[in-house]
Amino acid sequence: MGINGELISGKGQIPLLGICLGHQAICLADGSNLTRSPNGPVHGSPVSVENDGTGLFSELAEEHSMMRYNSLVILDVGESMVPNAWEGGTGLIMGARHRYYPIHGVQFHPESAGSPDGMAIIENFLSLCD
């Protein structure tokens, strides 16, 4: 991806929300492993996403439907990122947040019409930027 880890991480000076490829770039910059999804490509399909209620998922239900369009996934995260959302049934990482800085990523597409709670995730990010 031609990633510059310093630019992406920004050392917390600029809040960052990575969606899909952006999530992958954030995680890769932190030393995560990216691979083809073990379940094959998922394009335009709603998936069940479970979360731990932290970061972007604050005050959301523990499970919701979100739209995915991707064939690559983060298998494990680096030292600074903490997974906080997973695909129901598979456990694939669907979201992660930085331990110290306002840096968040989601594998799914909250901006999609097929993601009913997507706007709440965007609003949570904006509130985390304050």
Placement of each model-derived feature along the sequence:
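Conserved hydrophobic/aromatic beta-strand scaffold that supports enzyme active sites
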Residues: P46-S48, I93-G95, G105
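Hydrophobic/aromatic beta-strand patches that form the interior of the parallel beta-sheet core
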Residues: L17, T35, M67, N84, ...
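Acyltransferase
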Residues: A113-D130
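Histidine-centered divalent metal-coordination motifs
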Residues: C20, N70, H109
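Catalytic beta-strand/loop cores that center a nucleophilic Ser/Cys/Thr
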Residues: T54-Y100
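Cysteine-nucleophile active-site neighborhood
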Residues: M1-E59, S65, I122
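Short histidine/acidic/glycine/proline-rich micro-motifs that form metal-
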Residues: V73, E111-A113
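Short helix/strand-capping connector loops at secondary-structure junctions
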Residues: Y100-P110
